[in-house]
Amino acid sequence: MNRDNMDTTKRKEDHTKHTTDVIEFYEEGTAASSLNIATEKANSSPSILRRIINRAAWLSKKVDAMGVESTGIQRISPYERGTSKKQFLHVAGLWLSATGGLSSMSSFLLGPLLFGLSFRESVASSLISVTIGCLIAAYCSIMGPQSGCRQMVTARYLFGWWFVKLVALASIIGVMGWSVVNSVVGGEMLAAISNDKVPLWVGIVIVTVCSFLVAIFGIKQVIKVETYLSVPVLTAFLLLYISSSDKYSFVNAYVSKGNLDSSTRKGNWMSFFSLCYSITATWGSITADYYILFPEDTPYIQIFCLTFFGTFLPTCFVGILGLLLASVAMSYKPWSVEYDSHGMGGLLWAGFQRWNGFGKFCVVVLVFSLVSNNIINTYSAAFSIQLSSVFCAKIPRWFWSIVCTIICLVCALIGRNHFSTILGNFLPMIGYWISMYFILLFEENLVFRRFFLHLYTKEFPTVTGEINGPELVGSSKEVEKDAVTNIHLLKRKHKVTKHRYNWDKWEDYEVLTHGYAATFAFIVGVAGVVVGMAQAYWIGPIAAKFGEYGGDVAMWLSMAFSGVVYPPCRYLELRKFGR
């Protein structure tokens, strides 16, 4: 009986092997046939198309060989991240270089020069608003280590697969707007120290191209370069404090524009407040990008404090200097002439002028602060473009960095003679959308991911049986009870932390939220922008109540409108769709 069973088993195995051989033979034949058909189509296609494809393939291989970062918007898994404490030092250097530069100082100049505020009024307005902006940027940064995703990729958990594209577009406009401003300022500086021997457009090209050459390589190179640049740049700013100190007696000579009534002065104070808030708050759209290599169990408080102090201290350091220079220019005629002739670059050269040749060298060093800021903008903007469609995501990040550089260069060349107008009217608008994004993220984390996690049935499906890995995270109720932990951290022998996001589903359309609640709240927030903004092209009815030029309160109204609408809409969305 046993022998019969063995014979039967052998016949079944022979039959199975025969069937497998037939299937493999069929698949090989089909693959060969498909390859022949594809080859015939390629051979029959126009020769120009073949040359383009071959050239693109050759270029990609060359770029990869140069060590350019190939990772796009893909999540960095816990296994691929570092554990060295040097990462904290490098990121601290990154923030010192990126935020302690002329791009931050440029907005502070407008307190006295554009809004007619005294030095004391400008200091009070700017320091309070910058602090609030840094708090928002720091809060957004905590999404980086826990997710391993770029900032705008994490926004998919708020806005869903489709609507996040609108947020990504706003992020692109924001960071590229700063790049345009930086390029123009760099051109003005080079023109000022060369007595116009270096035309403004040439300086713009130099700053833009230098930024691109670093940004194309990837996050590791970006962080290293930013760290190295922070030392000479901050040293140059310290020297500018010293060099310009002989004119500080003119600071108090200018009080404020005497032709402004009390209401208009308050409105200008509020508009300058919103402008300075935008300087640091807009970092919230990309801060998480630079923490994706940190261990997944990095304490939130460490990331928050590193980002807050890393952006607050350098911004205030250069901002106060900018207010001093601008206040002197309002009372001291030679500096005023330099500003009228060469913009911010002329004002910086005036501060260094008594040091002659060494002063020119210091101005050139300060140009690197603009390059530092543009490097980050160009690097992060590419990821937002990849979020716009599946097709764009398949195109390497370095290609989109080239596109961003070209766009920045063209816009800077076109708007180079209208710097103050661009800066005063454009930058506050960047702060509008980040205010709405922040309040939605804050409420999602504080309310729904903490108290209503059981409603996320798509993201945390109920699991019966043993949990075997990252694909099975467990039910949301188990997560709330701390019954389910992060399997990755157990394997890496780090401190166990609990999930409140299923980050493994970052690109799963069937799991990610539809984004109806966040998008509707965002649209309602736009209504707050319309009634509260005070710009040259539009003054809202609420903003118009503050003087002749209005007072910009759009950021706070948009945040309030979105914050009130989102909770009930999000609750209904979770109850209806489970995601």
Curated annotation (Swiss-Prot):
Chain ranges passing through the membrane: 99-119, 123-143, 158-178, 199-219, 222-242, 275-295, 303-323, 363-383, 395-415, 422-442, 520-540, 546-566
Please indicate the ranges of residues that lie on the Cytoplasmic side.
1-98, 144-157, 220-221, 296-302, 384-394, 443-519, 567-579
Cellular-component GO terms for this entry? fungal-type vacuole; plasma membrane
Which Gene3D superfamilies did the record assign?
Hydantoin permease
For the Extracellular compartment, the record's topological domain ranges are 120-122, 179-198, 243-274, 324-362, 416-421, 541-545
* Compartments in which it is found: Membrane
Annotated GO biological process: vitamin transport
Major place of localization?
membrane
Q: Name one GO molecular function term.
A: transmembrane transporter activity
Query: Which InterPro entries does the record cross-reference, listed alphabetically?
Result: NCS1, Pur-cyt_permease, Pur-cyt_permease_Fcy2/21/22
Describe the task this protein carries out.
Answer: Thiamine-regulated, high affinity import carrier of pyridoxine, pyridoxal and pyridoxamine.
**What's the name of the protein?**
Vitamin B6 transporter TPN1
Q: Which organism is it from?
A: Saccharomyces cerevisiae (strain ATCC 204508 / S288c)
